[in-house]
């Protein structure tokens, strides 16, 4: 008997209950949904007609999750100005380079110290380096920090990470899977990623007058269909040229942010962002096998500590180089500390290449801890800054009059 709709309905009821509980105790919804996903899924018991394994509906739930990432990044793009990002181009390039160098170097060092082979070390370093754009976007929106002075640099670092990821995956997949053209593929990936982003920046500067006319649609029904058609087409096309679909959504949001319809788009997108965003974190939890985590506990805990320290240092250095205050700079590293879907993808590449089986449970546990801990660290960034300020005696600096979370 086909219970597909009932399975999806059951999943939504569980997500709703977890969301209500998180809201009641004024806690981030993200860890609740991830843990909920882990407790059910393929390893959960089947109780009569209530099937908590969600095997039949897994592809639909996973697709809901992918949509969540798109809406989260699209909304984040709507919150920014391309003009400001272009003006911050140098600081973004410098900040992104600093962030990648510090975290990737620490990952390499940790891999060698813990006894992995060269190729396994490259995989482990990749797992540790790439942050979760979906979680970062969700946290920035939830804590109302999109107007903060450091958020433009955070957004830039996320985009810079995508360029690094394209190059990294091309090179490492060539080394592990035996692709002899890995160097050429890496160079092509760089050119495509840079060119694609540049195209959207140009569009955001030149096309708003045309877009204002095209989007001058009175009917909300037709308007939202047009916006969603553009969103999914651009995201899907981005994937075909090996740029993350989430980055495509972010870039489209940046273009629409320059139009006079940006507020209307935001208003209509918010419910979809919240619903599908919740489904992303639930589906992410479903992908984690809780019974495989024990063998990598200490390895993951060490990596978590290293990541938090590395992120904080990288954020401070990048922020200060960009002229931000100590407080804003500390927020950078404490905001992009979460790890997620990209780390799992990197680990799976290593498994596909026949590397150590420990990589998968390590990545799962590492991501789980930081996906839960990351939003908490971001939320408590003010307290963390005050504590560190007592130790390092940073001079208090006055930020521009923007709302800080």
Swiss-Prot record:
Disruption phenotype: Deletion mutant is more sensitive to methylglyoxal than wild-type. The chain crosses the membrane at residues 3-23, 29-49, 60-80, 85-105, 108-128, 153-173, 183-203, 222-242, 268-288, 297-317, 332-352, 357-377. GO terms for cellular component: plasma membrane. Signal peptide: none annotated. The keyword Transmembrane helix applies. The keyword Transmembrane applies. It is a multi-pass membrane protein. Its main location: membrane. Potassium antiport activity requires the presence of KhtT. Activity is also modulated by KhtS. Has higher activity at alkaline pH. Potassium/proton antiporter that mediates the efflux of potassium ions from the cell. Can also mediate rubidium/proton antiport, but has no permeability for sodium or lithium ions. In the absence of KhtT, does not have antiport activity, but can catalyze potassium efflux. Involved in protection of the cell from methylglyoxal, a toxic by-product of glycolysis, via activation by S-lactoyl-BSH of the antiporter activity, leading to cytoplasmic acidification and methylglyoxal resistance. The transporter is composed of the integral membrane protein KhtU and the regulatory protein KhtT. This is K(+)/H(+) antiporter subunit KhtU.
């Amino acid at each position: 008997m086909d219970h597909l709709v009932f399975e999806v309905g059951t999943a939504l009821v569980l997500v709703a209950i977890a969301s209500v509980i998180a809201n009641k105790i004024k806690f981030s919804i993200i860890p609740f949904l991830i843990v909920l996903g882990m407790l059910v899924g393929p390893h959960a018991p089947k109780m009569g007609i209530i099937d908590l394994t969600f095997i039949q509906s897994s592809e639909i739930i996973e697709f809901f999750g992918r949509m969540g990432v798109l809406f989260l990044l699209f909304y984040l793009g709507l919150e920014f100005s391309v003009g400001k990002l272009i003006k911050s181009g140098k600081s973004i390039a410098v900040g992104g380079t600093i962030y990648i160098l510090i975290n990737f170097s620490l990952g390499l060092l940790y891999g060698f110290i813990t006894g992995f082979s060269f190729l396994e070390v490259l995989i482990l370093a990749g797992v540790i380096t790439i942050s979760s754009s979906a979680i970062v976007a969700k946290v920035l929106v939830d804590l109302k920090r999109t107007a903060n002075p450091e958020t433009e640099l955070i957004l830039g670092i996320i985009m810079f990470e995508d360029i690094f990821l394209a190059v990294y995956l091309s090179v490492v997949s060539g080394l592990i899977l035996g692709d002899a053209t890995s160097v050429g593929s890496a160079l092509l990936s760089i050119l495509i990623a840079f060119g694609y982003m540049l195209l959207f920046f140009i569009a955001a500067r030149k096309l708003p007058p045309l877009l204002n006319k095209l989007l001058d649609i009175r009917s909300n029904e037709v308007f939202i269909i047009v916006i969603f058609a553009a969103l999914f087409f651009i995201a899907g096309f981005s994937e075909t040229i090996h740029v993350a679909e989430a980055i495509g959504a972010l870039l489209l949001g940046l273009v629409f942010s320059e139009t006079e319809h940006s507020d209307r788009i935001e208003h209509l997108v918010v419910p979809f962002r919240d619903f599908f965003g919740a489904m992303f974190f639930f589906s992410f939890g479903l992908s984690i096998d809780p019974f495989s985590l024990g063998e990598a506990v200490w390895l993951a805990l060490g990596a978590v500590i290293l990541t938090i320290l590395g992120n904080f240092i990288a954020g401070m250095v990048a922020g200060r180089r960009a002229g931000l205050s100590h407080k804003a700079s500390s927020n950078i590293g404490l905001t992009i500390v979460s790890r997620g879907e990209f780390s799992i993808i990197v680990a799976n590449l290593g498994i596909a290449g026949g590397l150590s089986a420990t990589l998968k449970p390590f990545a799962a546990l590492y991501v789980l801890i930081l996906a839960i801990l990351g939003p908490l660290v971001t939320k408590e960034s003010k307290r963390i800054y005050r504590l560190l300020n007592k130790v390092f005696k940073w001079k208090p600096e006055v930020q521009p009059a923007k709302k800080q979370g």
